[in-house]
Amino acid sequence: MTVSGRSSWQNGKTTNAMRAGKLATERDLESANYGSRSVEKLRHERAVGNLNKGRFLGMNKWSDEQLKHSMARYEDLAATRHNLFAVIMPSGCGKTSLARTYGMVDVDELVSRAEHDQYVEMRNEIVCGRGDWHDHNTLWFARLNQTLALLDYSVPVVIFVHTEETALEIGARPVACLTLETTAHEMNISGRGPKFREFSRESLRSCKPSNRVPNQYRFKSNKELEAFFLEVMNVSGLPVGAPFKYSTSIWNSSYSRDVPGWILRGERAGTQQVSINELRLLFEQGKIPKECVDYYVRASYVPTQFDFGVTMFEWSQALGQLPGCYNSRRDFDTLTDLMGVFPPHSPKEVTRSNVTLRTLCHTFDILSMPDAKEIASYHVGEGHTLVTNLLANWKGITQFTTVSHLVFPWFKVCERDWSDKMKTLHSLVRCSKFFMNTRITEKDRQALMYMDLLVGRGEYTVDEMAEVELRTDDTYNTKHLSYDPNRQVFTNQQYKKDFITSVEEAYVRLKIEPKPVNVDGFIDFYHRRASWLTKGGLVYNKLPPEMKKFGGQVFDAIYNTCREIQGRHNKKSLFEVYELAEVLQGANENNFNLTKTQIKYEVGKKDRTLLPGTLVHFVVFTYVLYLAEKQGQIGSVRLNTDSEVDIRYFDKKMCTGVFHVLYDWADFNEQHSAWEMGVVVDYLKHLIVAPRDYAVFVEAIVAGMYNMGLHDRDGNVHKIWRGLYSGWRGTTWINTVLNFCYVHIALQNVERLFGVRVVLYVDHGGDDIDLGLSEPAVMPWFLEVMDAMLFKANKWKQMFGTRSEFFRNTICDGRVYASPTRALASFVAGDWEGAGRATVKERVVSLLDQIAKLRRRGCSEELCQGLTIATISHWCRIKDGEDWLSLPAEIIHGHPDDGGLGVPDRDNNFWRLEEKVPEINEEWYKVVVPDYKASRDYVNVLARDVEKFSLVIEEREKLARKLSEDSYDIEKSVDHERWKHLLNFRTRVIAKELAVEPMEDSVVFEGFLEYEVEEGTEKKFDLASRYQEFVSYLSLNGRAITKEELLDLMSDGEVCLEAIEFQGDIYYARLVPEFIAYRATMFCKEAINKGVCDAISAQLFFRTICWMSASVFEHAI
């Protein structure tokens, strides 16, 4: 082994003193005049012709002027990159391998693959005499510095480069130049193509750094080179994993002296003997550096664990993709029509968006702010929603993070590449509590996730054949495997046995405690269709066009006018007009389970496809699930269980000592075989106490699993072999039950293979899993088993650690968090599906709920307050003739008790009005709908149900007509007609009251903290409130019945009317997550019902609980 060709080590051996004398010292690294000494050396070597012997990356082309420029660049950059250190290694010497292993930066990864290939081609052209090194270097170094400007240098960063000149140009201080002898080098490059081999050889020949570069050694093997590299890291005081892997001669100051030797030596890496959790604890105690934990995590089966594993290698690789995606900065006139400067891609970007650039300019004068103007200038000509989102996100969220200076350049990425690049960065942020080298809070982590969604919603052409290919197979059977303990191998036969057992386990409560359902058969169920049909789209159907439309009238009794209303049927209104036989004409076994592709209007423009089932399939599946969903909980999943806002789902995850496996499936829907889906549904007919015809409908659904097809836009039908449709009535049921079965079998296999049972709880629903374990060592075993069972997952998306994440809610350090960026992206884009049918009050409530969510999650108060005023003003407009007129401010900000909408003004005040807003009497309007068949049948069924309590429904036809009005999509039209009468309302504001003010009472709050919801409490209140919505149509013994009398009848006198009518103060409820507001409501209802307080006192209790919960718990969800 030679030392840069200048001297040799005797027999390849040296003393520690000799080695230390040749290694970089901290004093060398901190020497401020390294650059000036280096430039003189380079000038001298050029003068004697040393540089003229090589032709690699243009070293023989440097002039004195270029050298001066290079050193000037170094001195400028070294000041800001004082923690950037370079290891010089020619191509083919293993720099990428070392960078990946030890989590460092590889110069070749600082550009995208396409850019890298372009630079390689340029070099090949120059070597062949067709090109200029000066042009190449100017572009190359400038491009490297673009990426390096994005990195975090708060702690030392090591970069592997080809040459000393590269180090100078990027402001890095060389600590070593490590090369291989020819034989070892040739072995390394033997697998490369001819051009790359020649490039690597030229790189090695031309690597002749100045004498100022310390530690210039040539090695016989990769192992020797790696050993010396670690010694360089040790003597330089740079943190690195496995510092004593080859030698213990030089201590690394990043480690405590009492760290176990096996950790220092990097032993057991990749084995089950290593506890990543123990390494994490050592890091938290300050005994080992992050690089040590990263080293072991990266060697394990799971690339990220306990927030470790994401290194500067991944960060630099991801950030290296950004500069090539930057737009050029373009100036624009801020006073012109911004819709022209930033054009919307779709009319819905204008008609459905809650926020536009005009909103931001009018409310905040946002483009007068230099940072916002700069961001916008990089996106001239790009989508309106994207630019709106970027400005709102930066000013309301991102600029307040501790790493905002590092994130700001991201906002230059063009719209075309925004989503893809931000998804990659989202994964790095999600899997770590470090933003590169900076440890960030959970609040900041949440703010920096989901930035890919800022691109908004969009319309696109579905790739139908891609959906077919995802679901193409050669069998209906499952190909999943399970471990056979007898044969000691994973087999499909064992999996099928285990799957049947897991389904039985999932449905065990249905077998042990079956619950009868008040349905006599399908006909009885059909007569109740007004209660189970939804107002969703008609999905896939064979209806003629004329059957999909309806017409109605609205009579205005005040102005004596009649307005014709035309609309398209939804599922509910269709069955008001047509009977089942008419709707299902032409349905048969061949088209029973077909689908067509539809757009999913998701934020982030994910271009995912909605696959709805047929209308007849919907009806059949609804009957099957109508009975199943009234049974007990399914396994440990969130089916037939407590409300999603039950605090127990969150409370049990706030304790310490639990380790979480957050498994992320890849294309979960497509992994299910027809056999697995069929078994999940088929078992229902054996377990549910059901009418005789129930089994026929179950079997129809099961048979349909084996006869699926996709009807494309050209009229062709393509065979579907596997996977469920995302728009089935039973999609959630099948996904969730299969989630349970898959995990149940996997845990069984873990026990068979490793002999451990450490599961504390399993929480899963849909395709989400949160597996709570008592022993962290089992976590990677679970992933290994899932892989062995042939389930598909993205390893980089798996989260193993102490943090819980479920349904995009994160529980960490006793608090619940969710991403403000995700909520903002959805809010700005608006609802592209259902918002068009919302009434004014519904829209106002929805907007206030969404803005409250933004506020809780950490959006700035200024942004939230401004968006409240702007969006409410926008949507509280009524069309009168050709004009859109705003509702009077008195109505918008008027106190609800005075008939106002109750929107707090800029000062968070309600307005008390001298004259109340006139109540819009429903008798002013009469809506004539085409028919009300479903509602009429439902009223007849209700009549039979209430007869059990000696109650009679009076005026059945009137009630049926009234119920049917809700089936048609006419609310908005009727609502606007009503509000038009109030456009000219004016009155004097006599006082203003704070919507929310501090409320504190430690006694009440302590009582709330000790409160436990008794089993059956919610059910008790639900049963007591039965039929209250029909009370005005009910009679008992020939006379009208009161609310109190009906309540006594339904609850046997156990519940009082004040308790079931108590709702809490919505303005205080918005201060806290739903699970706290729900619990506070139940607490107050119980207090009223038990006579502890009246409704007025309960309202004070509720406000106090919400106010104190917000300040004490600080949940950000």
From Swiss-Prot:
Q: What is its EC number?
A: 2.7.7.48
Domain of life from the UniProt record: Viruses
GO molecular function ontology, one term from the record: hydrolase activity
Provide a GO biological process annotation: DNA-templated transcription
Catalysed transformations (reactions) = RNA(n) + a ribonucleoside 5'-triphosphate = RNA(n+1) + diphosphate
- List the residue ranges of the region (Disordered): 1-23
Q: What InterPro entries is this protein classified in? A: DNA/RNA_pol_sf, RNA-dir_pol_luteovirus
Bias (Polar residues): 1-17
Q: Which SUPFAM superfamilies match?
A: DNA/RNA polymerases
- Which keywords are on file for this protein? Hydrolase, Nucleotide-binding, Nucleotidyltransferase, RNA-directed RNA polymerase, Transferase
- Check the record and name the Pfam families matching this protein: RdRP_4
User: What role does it play?
Assistant: RNA-dependent RNA polymerase which replicates the viral genome.
Under what name is this protein listed? RNA-directed RNA polymerase
Q: Which organism is it from?
A: Penicillium chrysogenum virus (isolate Caston/2003)
